[in-house]
Protein backbone atom coordinates (compact mmCIF):
# COMPACT_ATOMS: atom_id res chain seq x y z
CA UNK A 1 0.00 0.00 0.00
CA UNK A 2 2.70 2.50 0.96
CA UNK A 3 4.63 1.74 -2.24
CA UNK A 4 1.65 2.16 -4.54
CA UNK A 5 2.21 -1.22 -6.15
CA UNK A 6 -0.26 -2.24 -8.84
CA UNK A 7 -0.23 -5.88 -7.75
CA UNK A 8 -0.04 -7.30 -4.27
CA UNK A 9 2.51 -10.06 -3.57
CA UNK A 10 1.33 -13.64 -3.65
CA UNK A 11 0.95 -15.43 -0.30
CA UNK A 12 4.28 -17.20 -0.91
CA UNK A 13 6.02 -13.91 -1.73
CA UNK A 14 4.44 -12.20 1.28
CA UNK A 15 5.74 -14.96 3.55
CA UNK A 16 9.28 -14.35 2.28
CA UNK A 17 9.00 -10.56 2.46
CA UNK A 18 7.77 -10.48 6.05
CA UNK A 19 9.70 -13.43 7.51
CA UNK A 20 11.61 -12.85 10.73
CA UNK A 21 15.14 -11.43 10.32
CA UNK A 22 17.76 -14.12 9.94
CA UNK A 23 19.01 -16.67 7.41
CA UNK A 24 16.34 -17.87 4.99
CA UNK A 25 16.59 -20.16 1.97
CA UNK A 26 14.05 -19.49 -0.77
CA UNK A 27 13.84 -21.75 -3.82
CA UNK A 28 12.21 -20.06 -6.81
CA UNK A 29 12.18 -20.74 -10.53
CA UNK A 30 12.22 -18.44 -13.53
CA UNK A 31 9.39 -15.92 -13.63
CA UNK A 32 8.60 -16.28 -9.94
CA UNK A 33 9.25 -12.61 -9.23
CA UNK A 34 12.54 -13.06 -7.42
CA UNK A 35 13.85 -9.54 -8.01
CA UNK A 36 10.63 -7.87 -6.90
CA UNK A 37 10.41 -10.10 -3.84
CA UNK A 38 14.01 -9.36 -2.84
CA UNK A 39 13.41 -5.63 -3.28
CA UNK A 40 10.25 -5.82 -1.18
CA UNK A 41 12.10 -7.81 1.46
CA UNK A 42 14.69 -5.03 1.77
CA UNK A 43 11.95 -2.40 2.02
CA UNK A 44 10.23 -4.42 4.76
CA UNK A 45 13.46 -4.73 6.74
CA UNK A 46 14.23 -1.02 6.40
CA UNK A 47 10.66 0.13 7.07
CA UNK A 48 10.54 -1.93 10.26
CA UNK A 49 13.85 -0.59 11.50
CA UNK A 50 15.83 -3.82 11.29
CA UNK A 51 18.49 -2.41 8.96
CA UNK A 52 19.49 0.80 7.25
CA UNK A 53 20.07 0.80 3.47
CA UNK A 54 23.85 0.90 3.84
CA UNK A 55 23.70 -2.43 5.70
CA UNK A 56 22.10 -4.18 2.72
CA UNK A 57 24.23 -6.22 0.32
CA UNK A 58 22.62 -7.81 -2.73
CA UNK A 59 24.64 -10.29 -4.78
CA UNK A 60 23.72 -11.78 -8.16
CA UNK A 61 25.50 -13.62 -10.95
CA UNK A 62 25.40 -10.98 -13.70
CA UNK A 63 26.03 -7.23 -13.87
CA UNK A 64 22.66 -6.67 -15.51
CA UNK A 65 20.83 -8.46 -12.70
CA UNK A 66 22.82 -6.54 -10.07
CA UNK A 67 21.90 -3.24 -11.72
CA UNK A 68 18.25 -4.20 -11.94
CA UNK A 69 18.13 -5.33 -8.32
CA UNK A 70 19.81 -2.15 -7.08
CA UNK A 71 17.54 0.06 -9.15
CA UNK A 72 14.43 -1.77 -7.97
CA UNK A 73 15.40 -1.51 -4.30
CA UNK A 74 16.25 2.19 -4.56
CA UNK A 75 12.99 2.99 -6.32
CA UNK A 76 10.94 1.16 -3.71
CA UNK A 77 12.78 2.77 -0.80
CA UNK A 78 12.38 6.20 -2.38
CA UNK A 79 8.63 5.67 -2.70
CA UNK A 80 8.45 4.64 0.93
CA UNK A 81 10.39 7.69 2.12
CA UNK A 82 8.37 10.09 -0.04
CA UNK A 83 5.00 8.76 1.11
CA UNK A 84 3.53 11.03 3.83
CA UNK A 85 1.45 8.09 5.05
CA UNK A 86 4.63 6.40 6.24
CA UNK A 87 4.61 7.49 9.85
CA UNK A 88 5.28 6.15 13.31
CA UNK A 89 7.79 6.73 16.09
CA UNK A 90 10.82 5.81 13.94
CA UNK A 91 9.53 6.99 10.57
CA UNK A 92 11.60 10.16 10.46
CA UNK A 93 14.80 8.36 11.40
CA UNK A 94 14.14 5.66 8.79
CA UNK A 95 13.26 8.27 6.17
CA UNK A 96 16.51 10.12 6.87
CA UNK A 97 18.48 6.87 6.57
CA UNK A 98 16.91 6.20 3.17
CA UNK A 99 17.80 9.70 1.95
CA UNK A 100 21.39 9.61 3.22
CA UNK A 101 22.56 6.02 2.67
CA UNK A 102 22.48 3.52 -0.16
CA UNK A 103 22.30 -0.23 -0.70
CA UNK A 104 25.18 -2.13 -2.29
CA UNK A 105 24.38 -4.53 -5.13
CA UNK A 106 27.05 -6.36 -7.08
CA UNK A 107 27.96 -9.62 -8.77
CA UNK A 108 29.57 -12.34 -6.69
CA UNK A 109 32.81 -12.01 -8.66
CA UNK A 110 32.91 -8.23 -8.35
CA UNK A 111 32.28 -8.34 -4.62
CA UNK A 112 34.97 -10.99 -4.16
CA UNK A 113 37.34 -8.72 -6.07
CA UNK A 114 36.50 -5.83 -3.74
CA UNK A 115 37.33 -7.95 -0.69
CA UNK A 116 40.59 -9.13 -2.25
CA UNK A 117 41.70 -5.63 -3.20
CA UNK A 118 41.03 -4.39 0.32
CA UNK A 119 42.36 -7.30 2.36
CA UNK A 120 44.34 -9.56 0.02
CA UNK A 121 47.66 -8.75 1.69
CA UNK A 122 46.44 -10.60 4.79
CA UNK A 123 46.80 -13.93 2.91
CA UNK A 124 49.05 -12.62 1.27
CA UNK A 125 47.74 -12.34 -2.29
CA UNK A 126 48.74 -9.64 -4.75
CA UNK A 127 45.88 -7.13 -4.72
CA UNK A 128 46.64 -5.89 -8.23
CA UNK A 129 46.52 -9.31 -9.90
CA UNK A 130 45.03 -9.52 -13.39
CA UNK A 131 41.86 -11.61 -13.69
CA UNK A 132 42.03 -14.05 -16.60
CA UNK A 133 39.08 -15.74 -18.30
CA UNK A 134 38.46 -19.36 -19.26
CA UNK A 135 40.06 -19.01 -22.70
CA UNK A 136 43.29 -17.63 -21.23
CA UNK A 137 43.34 -20.38 -18.60
CA UNK A 138 42.94 -23.02 -21.28
CA UNK A 139 45.76 -21.51 -23.33
CA UNK A 140 48.16 -21.50 -20.37
CA UNK A 141 47.18 -25.06 -19.40
CA UNK A 142 47.73 -26.23 -22.98
CA UNK A 143 51.27 -24.82 -22.99
CA UNK A 144 52.01 -26.51 -19.67
CA UNK A 145 50.69 -29.92 -20.74
CA UNK A 146 52.66 -29.72 -24.00
CA UNK A 147 55.86 -29.31 -21.96
CA UNK A 148 55.09 -32.28 -19.67
CA UNK A 149 57.67 -35.03 -20.26
CA UNK A 150 56.26 -37.79 -18.03
CA UNK A 151 53.98 -40.50 -19.46
CA UNK A 152 50.48 -40.16 -18.04
CA UNK A 153 49.16 -43.10 -16.05
CA UNK A 154 46.00 -43.26 -18.16
CA UNK A 155 45.67 -42.94 -21.89
CA UNK A 156 44.34 -39.44 -22.51
CA UNK A 157 44.61 -37.00 -25.40
CA UNK A 158 46.39 -33.77 -24.52
CA UNK A 159 43.15 -31.81 -24.87
CA UNK A 160 41.52 -34.16 -22.37
CA UNK A 161 44.41 -33.71 -19.94
CA UNK A 162 43.97 -29.94 -20.19
CA UNK A 163 40.27 -30.32 -19.48
CA UNK A 164 40.95 -32.64 -16.53
CA UNK A 165 43.55 -30.27 -15.11
CA UNK A 166 41.27 -27.24 -15.25
CA UNK A 167 38.28 -29.19 -13.95
CA UNK A 168 40.15 -30.55 -10.92
CA UNK A 169 41.67 -27.15 -10.23
CA UNK A 170 38.24 -25.49 -10.35
CA UNK A 171 36.79 -28.08 -7.96
CA UNK A 172 39.66 -27.46 -5.56
CA UNK A 173 38.91 -23.73 -5.61
CA UNK A 174 35.20 -24.33 -5.11
CA UNK A 175 35.87 -26.51 -2.06
CA UNK A 176 38.70 -24.27 -0.80
CA UNK A 177 41.27 -27.09 -0.60
CA UNK A 178 44.89 -27.07 -1.74
CA UNK A 179 46.86 -29.69 -3.64
CA UNK A 180 48.47 -31.16 -0.51
CA UNK A 181 45.05 -31.91 0.98
CA UNK A 182 43.82 -33.58 -2.20
CA UNK A 183 47.09 -35.48 -2.54
CA UNK A 184 46.76 -36.85 1.00
CA UNK A 185 43.21 -38.03 0.32
CA UNK A 186 44.28 -39.54 -2.98
CA UNK A 187 47.12 -41.42 -1.28
CA UNK A 188 44.72 -42.70 1.37
CA UNK A 189 42.41 -43.99 -1.37
CA UNK A 190 45.30 -45.76 -3.11
CA UNK A 191 46.35 -47.43 0.12
CA UNK A 192 42.81 -48.62 0.78
CA UNK A 193 42.58 -50.07 -2.72
CA UNK A 194 45.91 -51.85 -2.39
CA UNK A 195 44.89 -53.23 1.00
CA UNK A 196 41.70 -54.85 -0.26
CA UNK A 197 41.74 -58.69 -0.01
CA UNK A 198 42.76 -60.50 -3.17
CA UNK A 199 40.66 -63.16 -4.85
CA UNK A 200 41.74 -66.69 -3.75
CA UNK A 201 42.71 -67.82 -7.26
CA UNK A 202 43.85 -64.50 -8.66
CA UNK A 203 46.62 -64.92 -11.23
CA UNK A 204 47.97 -61.42 -10.71
CA UNK A 205 48.24 -59.05 -7.79
CA UNK A 206 45.51 -56.77 -9.13
CA UNK A 207 42.55 -57.36 -11.38
CA UNK A 208 42.24 -55.19 -14.48
CA UNK A 209 39.51 -53.16 -12.83
CA UNK A 210 41.65 -52.62 -9.73
CA UNK A 211 44.64 -51.64 -11.85
CA UNK A 212 42.48 -49.12 -13.69
CA UNK A 213 41.49 -47.57 -10.35
CA UNK A 214 45.12 -47.37 -9.27
CA UNK A 215 46.11 -45.83 -12.59
CA UNK A 216 43.49 -43.13 -12.07
CA UNK A 217 44.94 -42.45 -8.61
CA UNK A 218 48.39 -42.07 -10.14
CA UNK A 219 46.97 -39.86 -12.88
CA UNK A 220 45.33 -37.65 -10.25
CA UNK A 221 48.71 -37.20 -8.58
CA UNK A 222 50.16 -36.19 -11.93
CA UNK A 223 47.37 -33.65 -12.39
CA UNK A 224 48.12 -32.23 -8.94
CA UNK A 225 51.77 -31.81 -9.95
CA UNK A 226 50.60 -29.97 -13.05
CA UNK A 227 48.27 -27.81 -10.98
CA UNK A 228 51.13 -26.83 -8.66
CA UNK A 229 53.21 -25.81 -11.68
CA UNK A 230 50.24 -24.04 -13.23
CA UNK A 231 49.52 -22.03 -10.07
CA UNK A 232 53.19 -21.11 -9.70
CA UNK A 233 53.19 -19.83 -13.27
CA UNK A 234 50.00 -17.86 -12.60
CA UNK A 235 51.56 -16.23 -9.54
CA UNK A 236 54.72 -15.34 -11.47
CA UNK A 237 52.63 -13.64 -14.15
CA UNK A 238 50.40 -11.88 -11.61
CA UNK A 239 47.27 -13.73 -12.77
CA UNK A 240 44.16 -14.88 -10.91
CA UNK A 241 41.04 -16.56 -12.22
CA UNK A 242 37.50 -15.99 -10.96
CA UNK A 243 37.46 -19.24 -9.00
CA UNK A 244 40.65 -18.35 -7.14
CA UNK A 245 39.38 -14.86 -6.47
CA UNK A 246 36.18 -16.23 -4.95
CA UNK A 247 38.03 -18.83 -2.87
CA UNK A 248 40.52 -16.27 -1.55
CA UNK A 249 37.73 -13.83 -0.66
CA UNK A 250 35.78 -16.56 1.14
CA UNK A 251 38.92 -17.58 3.00
CA UNK A 252 39.53 -14.01 4.10
CA UNK A 253 35.98 -13.64 5.38
CA UNK A 254 36.19 -16.94 7.27
CA UNK A 255 39.61 -16.55 8.86
CA UNK A 256 39.95 -12.82 9.51
CA UNK A 257 37.19 -11.36 11.73
CA UNK A 258 37.88 -7.79 10.62
CA UNK A 259 36.90 -8.71 7.05
CA UNK A 260 33.54 -10.10 8.11
CA UNK A 261 32.88 -7.18 10.42
CA UNK A 262 33.54 -4.67 7.66
Region roles according to the model:
Residues 44, 75, 79, 143-150, ...:
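A generic structural signal for well-ordered alpha-helical segments enriched in polar/charged residues
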Residues 1-27, 32, 36-37, 55-57, ...:
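Accessory N-terminal region flanking or inserted into the helicase ATPase core
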Residues 60, 81-207, 221-228, 237-240:
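Conserved ATP-dependent motor core of P-loop NTPases, especially the RecA-like helicase ATPase domain
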Residues 1-124, 261:
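P-loop NTPase Walker
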Amino acid sequence: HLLGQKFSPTPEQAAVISSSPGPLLVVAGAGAGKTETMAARVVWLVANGYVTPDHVLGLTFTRKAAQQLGQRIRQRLQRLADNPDFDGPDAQRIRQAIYTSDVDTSTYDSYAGTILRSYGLLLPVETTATIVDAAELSEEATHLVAQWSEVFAVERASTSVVSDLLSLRAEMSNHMVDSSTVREENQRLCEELIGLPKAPRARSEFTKEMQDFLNVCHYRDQLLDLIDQFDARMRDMGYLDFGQQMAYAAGLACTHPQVGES
